[in-house]
């Protein structure tokens, strides 16, 4: 894999509290580049939360952020497809991250190492992670 930087492709919508936790996690993991796709509000009721979400993305000062702010609500499926397609045109590998995802320190490094390790293996199309839901 020739691409030394593996960006995170982050999808966000009107959930600023979720996004704040996700961004803290990405910061702790040392992510160098984020492509953020912020969907537009579904209606007036979501406009404030969408604005707060976008403000959090604009305030990131610890890595490069390439922010796309949708003027209309595209919906999750269309927004993800368009975002992944755009980033795939520029990078061989990337990590998809939603605004409600948090992970332990080292997750980004582990995923990056796995992507680099399997880059030439035609049997491997993607790397993913999952954990059993914690019940408290």
Each PLM stretch: what is its role?
Residues 81-93:
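Active-site nucleotide-sugar/metal-binding loop of Leloir-type enzymes
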Residues 1-28:
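N-proximal low-complexity "stem/linker" segments adjacent to membrane-targeting elements
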Residues 91-102:
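Short beta-strand-to-loop acidic/aromatic patch adjacent to the donor-nucleotide binding site
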Residues 25-68:
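Acidic donor-binding segment of Leloir-type glycosyltransferases
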Residues 8-10, 36, 96, 126:
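Structural beta-sheet core signal
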Residues 32, 92, 125:
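Short acidic/polar active-site loop segments enriched in Thr and Asp
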Residues 71-79:
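A short, glycine-/small-residue-rich helix N-cap motif at loop->alpha-helix starts
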Residues 106-136:
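Conserved donor NDP-sugar-binding/catalytic core segment of glycosyltransferases
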């Amino acid at each position: 894999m020739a691409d030394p930087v593996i960006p995170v492709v982050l999808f966000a919508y009107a959930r600023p509290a979720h996004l704040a936790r996700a961004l803290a996690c990405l910061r702790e993991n040392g992510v160098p580049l984020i492509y953020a796709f912020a969907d537009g509000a579904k209606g007036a009721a979501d406009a404030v939360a969408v604005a707060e979400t976008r403000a959090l993305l604009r305030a990131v000062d610890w890595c490069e952020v390439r922010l796309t702010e949708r003027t209309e609500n595209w919906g999750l499926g269309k927004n993800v497809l368009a975002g992944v397609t755009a980033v795939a045109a520029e990078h061989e590998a990337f990590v998809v991250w939603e605004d409600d995802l948090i992970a332990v320190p080292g997750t980004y490094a582990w995923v990056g190492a796995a992507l680099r390790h399997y880059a030439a293996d035609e049997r491997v199309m993607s790397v993913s992670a999952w954990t059993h839901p914690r019940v408290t």
